[in-house]
């Protein structure tokens, strides 16, 4: 199954199966009012019991800066035409590899830099200073490379801040989509149906979506439904295994696939209601190391930790 976003009117005319549309929402948009603040608080909480205390607290500062930049730089745009075109082409409406960005994302970047500079360490200060002095063209080139998954083209210390701004931009746009989502047969379920980016992790939720697994987008912060006990990367079900560091009842596990050799973290809200897709993924880096030792490759990206090769 794949997920496509269509205008509300078209969804009504198509008379999509009510059980799929109503009881298993294919797509959930982020609540930007408290997303980044909640992430910052979770990072700070996890830092208290982590050997990565300094980096988790630093990441919390970035998340807090994102919350402020979001508040100070609202975005209003007409997205109905973009959605209609994406329906015709059968592509994600905000495809990160082809979408024509405006200067708004750079405005968000400079807002983040201004917020973070006063308390930045010497190493972070150097990265922020370099970004602040970079030309618009240089920033666009680095953004292009990151959105095309060409991570080796951008140093990790710069990539973090550029992605933080791009993520804010895409999240703002995603929240203005006036359509609904429908699930239908197709491919590429491993990528976000809104922006075509990779997930960061997946969350088995509680509440109105109790027991359902949603992949969380590393860019636009949207979440899309993928059934459990199926590889989110290749959709095979034959050779799945679940790994954890503590016990079989751990709130954070890794789902590995013997068919494609990949793995993705799964967070269980029923085990810990406070788990957060980005924060808990970042705080469980030891589990990533274990999965690499076992020969599995990560099928996701964390916005606070970019590969340098």
Swiss-Prot record:
It is found in: Cytoplasm. GO terms for cellular component: cytosol. GO terms for molecular function: ferric iron binding. It holds the Pfam family FdhE_central. The keyword Lyase does not apply. Keywords: Cytoplasm. GO terms for biological process: protein maturation. The keyword Cytoplasm applies. Gene3D superfamilies: FdhE-like domain (3.90.1670.10). It comes from the Bacteria. Its main location: cytoplasm. Belongs to the FdhE family. Necessary for formate dehydrogenase activity. This is Protein FdhE homolog.
């Amino acid at each position: 199954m794949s997920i496509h976003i269509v205008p509300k009117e078209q969804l009504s005319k198509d008379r999509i199966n009510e059980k799929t549309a109503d009881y298993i929402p294919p797509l959930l948009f982020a609540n930007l009012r408290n997303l980044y603040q909640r992430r910052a608080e979770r990072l700070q909480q996890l830092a208290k019991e982590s050997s990565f205390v300094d980096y988790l607290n630093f990441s919390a500062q970035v998340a807090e800066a994102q919350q402020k930049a979001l508040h100070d730089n609202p975005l209003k745009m007409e997205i109905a035409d973009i959605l209609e075109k994406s329906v015709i082409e059968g592509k994600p409406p905000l495809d990160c590899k082809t979408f024509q960005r405006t200067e708004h994302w750079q405005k968000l970047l400079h807002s983040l830099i201004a917020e973070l500079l006063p308390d930045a360490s010497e190493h972070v200060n150097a990265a922020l200073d370099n970004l602040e002095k970079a030309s618009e063209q240089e920033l666009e080139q680095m953004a292009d490379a990151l959105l095309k998954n060409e991570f080796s083209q951008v140093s990790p210390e710069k990539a973090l801040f550029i992605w933080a701004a791009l993520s804010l931009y895409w999240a703002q746009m995603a929240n203005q989509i006036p359509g609904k989502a429908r699930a239908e047969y197709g491919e590429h379920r491993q990528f976000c149906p809104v922006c075509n980016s990779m997930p960061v992790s997946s969350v088995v939720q509680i509440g109105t979506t109790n027991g359902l697994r949603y992949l969380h987008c590393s860019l636009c912060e949207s979440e899309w439904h993928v059934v459990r006990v199926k590889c989110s990367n290749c959709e095979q079900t034959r050779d799945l295994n679940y790994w954890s560091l503590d016990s079989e009842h751990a709130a954070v596990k890794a789902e590995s696939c013997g068919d494609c050799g990949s793995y993705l973290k799964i967070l269980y809200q029923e085990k810990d209601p406070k788990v957060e897709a980005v924060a808990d993924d970042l705080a469980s880096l030891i589990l990533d190391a274990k999965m690499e030792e076992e020969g599995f490759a990560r099928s996701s990206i964390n916005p606070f930790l970019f590969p340098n090769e």
